[in-house]
């Protein structure tokens, strides 16, 4: 059996074999392609009416993909270019929505714990200490999956937002090895009141998902959860901690609360901006109807 190209630790986790296998567990077909020793994973998505499209999460676009897309009757190829140079000679259109956060917050954790604490906003340090004084206990184990899902339901109902189906999280936790995907929980008086999913990938730890019980918001468990994950990431050899999506523009945007929370962990770090998602049209008719449907949805 031919060995697949090794995906560098500098490649985003969304291009890892673990993520590809998880996507297959959710029912999606995936493809692997290589060129000049570089491997990419492609995920096939299906939509009502307009059919299928390819998505390359945080990966490079290969010209050879166009032939594969035509063979598989794909409407368009979506990808997240690293910079403008990478799309300079491609016929692309901006996607109607971004598949991944366009702005992320990543801190350098090669520093000592003392320095990391000193670079936090005073309120963040205070809340970490408060959670410790309140007796919050942090644990990490996939045995807490039901507690995590309970908190996800509570958070979705409270904020009026749509999370992934429960089966999505179960398959993620079951498929991705526990040494890579860690489920952290915060317990208060023997009750799980907050939980996070964190990926340890190469030199980077990535905060994927979090959920809380708002009844216990005053004990500041989410702050201690993040701090424990940062310390564990340091001890495992990670050099960066990726808090995921933020939105630093717009005063009253829906991201303001979570952005303020994340940015509090470093006053010396600036967020990283990406170009967002772009599409290469394979079937103009399918893509035309797709954009019409998207416009109708945005109005409703």
Regions found by a protein language model. Give the residues of each.
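A structural signal for short, well-ordered beta-strand segments and their strand-loop junctions
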Residues: 75-80, 137-141, 185, 240-242
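Aromatic (often tryptophan-rich) hydrophobic motifs at membrane interfaces
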Residues: 67-68, 174, 180-287
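Active-site/acyl-donor-binding loops of N-acyltransferases
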Residues: 4-8, 46-48, 90-114, 239-300
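A conserved beta-strand-loop-helix scaffold within acyl/acetyltransferase catalytic domains
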Residues: 1-50, 84, 92-218
């Amino acid at each position: 059996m031919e060995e697949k190209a090794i995906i560098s630790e500098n490649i985003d986790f969304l291009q890892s074999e673990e993520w590809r296998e998880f996507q297959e567990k959710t029912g999606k077909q995936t493809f692997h392609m290589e060129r000049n020793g570089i491997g990419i994973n492609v995920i096939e998505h299906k939509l009502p009416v307009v059919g299928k499209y390819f998505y390359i999460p945080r990966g490079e676009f290969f010209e050879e993909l166009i032939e594969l897309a035509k063979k598989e009757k794909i409407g368009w190829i979506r990808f997240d270019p690293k910079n403008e140079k990478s799309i300079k000679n491609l016929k692309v259109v901006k996607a109607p929505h971004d598949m991944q956060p366009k702005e992320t917050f990543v801190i350098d954790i090669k520093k000592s714990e003392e320095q990391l604490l000193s670079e936090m906003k005073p309120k963040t340090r205070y809340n970490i200490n408060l959670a410790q004084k309140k007796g919050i206990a942090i644990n990490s184990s996939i045995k807490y999956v039901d507690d995590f899902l309970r908190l996800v339901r509570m958070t979705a109902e409270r904020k009026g937002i749509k999370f992934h189906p429960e089966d999505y999280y179960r398959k993620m936790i079951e498929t991705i090895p526990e040494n890579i995907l860690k489920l952290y929980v915060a317990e208060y008086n023997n009750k799980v009141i907050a939980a996070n999913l964190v990926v340890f990938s190469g030199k980077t730890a990535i905060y994927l998902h979090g959920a809380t019980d708002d009844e216990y918001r005053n004990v500041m468990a989410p702050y201690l959860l993040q701090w424990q994950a940062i310390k564990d990431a340091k001890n495992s050899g990670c050099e960066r901690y990726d808090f995921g999506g933020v939105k630093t523009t717009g005063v009253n945007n829906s991201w303001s609360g979570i952005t303020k929370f994340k940015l509090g962990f470093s006053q010396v770090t600036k967020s990283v901006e990406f170009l967002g998602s772009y599409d290469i049209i394979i079937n103009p008719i399918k893509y035309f109807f797709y954009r019409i449907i998207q416009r109708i949805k945005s109005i409703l």
